[in-house]
A protein has these predicted regions:
Chain A
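Transmembrane alpha-helices and adjacent helix-loop boundaries
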Residues: 1-334
Length: 334, 398, 289
């Protein structure tokens, strides 16, 4: 890569084009939401959790080009780890969160080491197999996971001994926001580092990267593990915020939806996760009132349109509109 | 000029009702309208609307005030309990409901226990039947049934009526476990032998394997427990497809054979014995009122089932509680109002257990017969005023 | 004991036949066009729903099957021309996501039209009864599946090994560049094959409705099974998909009989182990082996 292309998210950050205002805006909105949300606060927490989840996928899928449909395995692993820790060991949220992230990272490391040498459809199938194994196992291990009934009795102690997790959701929201911010900074640092740039190269042409001596497999393993840790963190957040873990955290559907969210928002943008998660959850919430399955139809169409016409996702909408308008103007002037 | 007149009239109406000013009492109803358990939402809603057509959409409170009883319906989509919990939070925080109701699935009912405690909101369970639900929070009251009431009744009846060996195939979730446990207990206590027991996945629709295993064990009867709807229909189809009926094995069931589902079965089910707390075709006057109203309002779709009677009686109890305490009382006061109350329900006499806040009612054993060209459940035995056996076996530790 | 073992085997084979009929189209198109098509289950689902609708309204069973097959094939043609063709050149990710989008759209439409309750195909009475096969009775339906599956497998095998179309197909799978170089109309081949594949899926969905029950979540629920057959068998390998389908059917059924609770996750664990051992599948076509 000679000069960073300002059009891509990576390039934009690299060339400093995303101004301070641009960066501050999403966080300002998130903080403002806390004060204005009223009864919608727990909805906001859900959005934050899905943003983190999608962000984790952006690292693996968007930047490193690891086409996985198994991200829910890490989300679910982190969620159950946090829940089981709270029930059997300690209900302290910070400790539980750290443990959940650690064990999920380990899980990511092990599975990544096993499967990252494969590519294409075989790799995809392996990721699907992992999620399926975990889902089916959790489904029948009812003594451990509660099965279909879900993990009951998850009590989370107040954060720092002071801030209780109630159904009104204030603690959960701020907690999720802080966790998301920390991970975002980590992700940003990673993708703008030389390591991150090498991932870009690996995604585009792994053979060439190997030829110049890059340890491709190790780099992929590293980013896969980081991505797993982030997804596990999102899962732990989910458990702490809702004080409940259901089988859906491990479902194939969840795995698919997070990929959908990322594509809709725009991959390799980091902020694409923000846009995608917000739009998706809003669409789902709004259209659920119209009809319970209408949102599936809308999301399906959006997905098809995005793949065919809007490769950079919704974040790219501005650029695409401008180029379309530009072409129209050129045709007019002829 | 006309506008001015109608404006004055409107003011006058408001002024007149002002002294008995309208308050609103909002109830959030969480049930499934889509997915595998899609019938429950509609059944609850139809029964509630029918009830309100007869008894009115408002109640008079203790001070004579008019209380508008409003229902807000949400679809749990036959999804996991986290969905039900999320909907409950939304209903309490956004819609500001003062009471939650519905819940056809036990995991859904159980998931809202801590919301009831934090928001101090009563939960009226209109179907979910796992015995331990009402212990989850002092805000639970149930108007439907507990599975042990069913399992115990049919286990005992089977052993006392010539069935010696039974193979049980029950669904792998809390109500299924209850059914299996209590059938086994009462069947064995009355001298019967359990020759095998299998648990099937909650949304299983392919029962070939289980039928085959049952056939190999050569029982006198198979006891099934499946959620009503597609799993039970597939189960019964597999039962005759795989030759169990031909082998002379009887089928014992529960709510799978409600009147609502009978049209989906072939004549193969004639002779099937089932246990239930509501026989739809009973001739009680209260039942006639409910059934007639439902047919009047919903035509063919007005078939009554245990969802209808659970919701109907729940509304009756809620109206009683509102009459006693008004629209803005503390949640526990409404629960207190319902404790110990007896009602002449369309199903028979019922009482809300004052200690457990759970239902005490008649349990009926029925056989499927062809009456007037249609498949129908016909009562062959009644066990009066059964208290939940699980509560008796597991008293609250003092 | 022997009769029990035979029953388990027959159950497994009949299940495998359904998986084969549905998945064979997918393995050929994935091997031929190198497109990951997660929407393949939707064609099976549509075939099933069409057959269900027709048989519930009194149409003759075999006519309904024919119409279901044709309907799925037509929809396949429509899809191929409009949304699948642009995918040939785009990467895996685009293919995965666009076909997921198709699944969502189809699922929502099916729910809207037919409702969320499982949908029944009305099989003729003689197929819903057990048949006396000598030493015991066995469901006629399952025997029917084995018969139909066997016939289709035979026809396809003769087609692929013995006909000109089959030869072209094998050539294009083994070496697409060479195939184009010798002047084969590869895009016509793609379209024709895609249509045959989706039509077969529609047939499989229709006759398999007694095992893979029809409901709106069909396409999402069973896509993993179809992908397992394709990938474990080896993309593009007809023989591989047959073997994989049989293996999947028998292992899954046997598992349910003996280790009922553990069966599902043991199955996926086995798939995982197998793919690590043989990433190209157990019987991959020549160019990939």
């Amino acid at each position: 890569m000679a000069t960073p292309n300002p059009a891509t998210g990576l390039g934009a950050i690299a060339t400093g084009q995303l101004s301070v205002v641009g960066h501050a805006l999403p966080w300002a909105i998130a903080v403002a939401f806390f004060f204005l949300a009223g009864g919608y606060l727990s909805f906001g927490t859900q959005v934050l959790i899905w943003i983190l989840f999608a962000l984790s996928l952006d690292l693996a899928l968007g930047y490193a080009g690891i086409v996985t449909l198994g991200q829910a395995a890490f989300f679910g692993f982190g969620a159950y780890a946090a829940g089981l820790f709270a029930i059997h060991v300690s209900s302290d949220p910070i400790l539980g969160h750290l443990i959940a992230v650690a064990v999920t990272a380990l899980f990511g490391l092990v599975t990544g080491a096993l499967i990252l040498h494969t590519t294409g459809v075989t790799f995809l199938m392996l990721t699907l197999a992992i999620v399926s194994v975990m889902f089916e196992y959790a489904n029948q291990a009812t003594k451990l996971t509660g099965g279909d009934d879900g993990l009951q009795g998850v009590n989370i102690a107040p954060l720092f001994g002071l801030f209780e997790f109630t159904m009104f959701g204030q603690t959960a929201y701020l907690y999720a926001l802080v966790v998301l911010f920390i991970w975002f900074v980590i992700a940003w640092r990673v993708v703008s580092s030389p390591f991150g740039r090498s991932l870009d190269g690996i995604r585009q042409n792994p053979r060439r990267m190997r030829a110049i001596g890059t340890p491709v497999w190790w780099r992929l393993l590293a980013i896969y593990t980081l991505s797993a840790a982030m997804a596990g963190s999102a899962g732990a957040l989910s458990t702490h915020a809702t004080r409940f873990v259901g089988l859906s955290v491990l479902s194939l559907f969840t795995s698919g939806i997070v990929a959908v969210i990322l594509i809709l928002g725009g991959i390799r943008r980091l902020y694409g996760a923000f846009v995608g998660a917000t739009i998706y959850l809003l669409v789902q919430d709004w259209s659920a009132k119209v009809s319970p399955y209408f949102w599936e139809f809308i999301v399906g169409l959006m997905l098809i349109a995005t793949v065919l016409f809007l490769e950079g996702g919704l974040m790219d909408l501005g650029r695409v509109m401008r180029s379309v308008l530009g072409r129209i103007r050129k045709a007019d002037s002829k | 000029m006309r506008k001015l007149l109608s404006g004055i009239c409107a003011l006058g109406v408001v002024a007149m009702t002002g002294s008995a000013s309208a308050e609103t009492f909002k109830i959030g109803l969480i049930a499934s309208y889509t997915g595998a358990f899609a019938t429950w939402g509609t059944q609850f809603q139809n029964a509630i609307e029918a009830f309100q057509s007869i008894h009115g959409k408002s109640v008079k409170g203790p001070k004579g005030e008019i209380i508008d009883v409003q229902l807000v319906y949400r679809d749990a989509g036959s999804a996991g309990p986290d969905k039900a919990k999320q909907l409950a939070e939304e209903l309490v925080l956004r819609e500001k409901v003062s009471m939650l109701g519905g819940f056809e699935l036990s995991p859904h009912a159980m998931s809202v226990a801590d919301i009831s405690k934090q928001a101090k909101v009563p939960i009226v369970v209109m179907n979910a039947a796992t015995a331990s639900i009402t212990r989850g929070s002092p805000y639970y009251v149930r108007t439907s049934l507990t599975i042990p009431q069913w399992g115990q009744a049919i286990g005992k009846w089977a052993a006392e009526n010539g069935i010696k060996k039974v193979y049980t195939i029950t669904s792998d979730y809390a109500p299924g476990h209850d059914a299996e446990a209590y059938f086994h207990k009462s069947f064995k206590a009355a001298g019967g032998e359990i020759v095998g027991a299998d648990r099937t996945a909650l949304r299983e629709t392919n029962f070939a394997v289980y039928m085959e295993k049952a056939l190999q064990a050569k029982p006198d009867a198979v006891y099934m427990f499946q959620p009503g709807g597609s799993p039970s229909i597939s189960f019964v189809k597999a039962f005759s497809e795989r030759g169990l009926k031909q082998a002379g094995i009887k089928l014992l069931g529960n709510g799978e054979f409600a009147e609502l589902y009978l049209p989906h079965f072939s004549d193969d089910v004639i002779g099937t014995i089932s246990v239930n707390h509501y026989t739809e075709t009973n001739t009680r006057p209260e039942n006639k009122i409910m059934r007639d109203q439902l047919i009047k309002q919903f035509g063919e779709k007005g078939v009554t089932d245990i969802a209808s009677v659970g919701a109907w009686d729940a509304m009756a109890l809620i109206y009683i509680a509102l009459r006693e305490h008004g629209a803005s009382a503390d949640g526990l006061k409404y629960i207190d109002a319902m404790k110990g109350k007896t009602l002449a329900s369309p199903r028979g006499p019922i009482m809300i257990d004052p200690e457990e806040r759970d239902i005490i009612q008649n349990i009926y054993i029925r056989r499927i017969e062809k009456v007037g060209g249609k498949l129908q459940n016909v009562d062959i035995a009644t066990i009066p005023m059964v208290k939940d056996p699980w509560k008796i076996d597991n008293p609250v530790k003092r | 004991m022997l009769s029990f073992a035979l029953t388990v085997l027959l159950d497994g084979i009949s299940y495998g036949m359904v998986l084969f009929i549905i998945s064979v189209g997918l393995t050929v198109t994935m091997g031929l066009m190198r497109v990951i098509n997660l929407a393949h289950g939707s064609f099976a689902m549509i075939g099933g729903y069409v057959a269900g609708y027709l048989t519930q309204h009194g149409v003759d069973f075999f006519l309904a099957l024919l119409l279901a097959t044709v309907a799925a094939g037509l929809l396949g043609a429509l899809c191929e021309v409009t949304v699948i063709r642009p995918l040939y050149r785009k990467g895996e990710l685009a293919q995965v996501l666009l076909t997921i989008g198709i699944v969502f759209v189809v699922t929502a439409l099916i729910t809207e039209i037919f409702g969320a309750f499982p949908y029944r195909v009305e099989f003729p009475v003689y197929l819903t009864q057990p048949l006396d096969i000598g030493f015991r009775t066995y469901p006629a339906y399952r025997l029917f599946l084995i018969l139909v599956g066997g016939i289709i497998a035979l026809i396809l095998w003769l087609l692929i090994e013995g006909s000109l179309y089959g030869a072209k197909l094998r050539a294009a799978v083994d070496n697409p560049r060479m195939a184009r170089a010798v002047g084969m109309n590869v895009s016509l081949l793609f379209t024709a094959t895609f249509i045959v594949g989706t039509a077969l899926a529609g047939l499989g969905g229709a006759i398999g409705a007694g095992i893979l029950s029809l409901e709106p979540s069909y396409a999402l629920k069973y896509v993993v099974l179809f992908l397992v057959v394709v990938i474990v068998g080896g993309e593009g390998s007809f023989k591989g998909s047959f073997v994989a389908a049989m293996a999947l059917g028998i292992i899954d059924t046997t598992g349910k009989y003996f280790v009922a609770a553990a069966a599902p996750y043991l199955l996926y664990a086995a798939v995982f182990a197998l793919l690590l051992w043989r990433p190209q599948g157990i019987l991959p076509p020549k160019s990939l082996a």
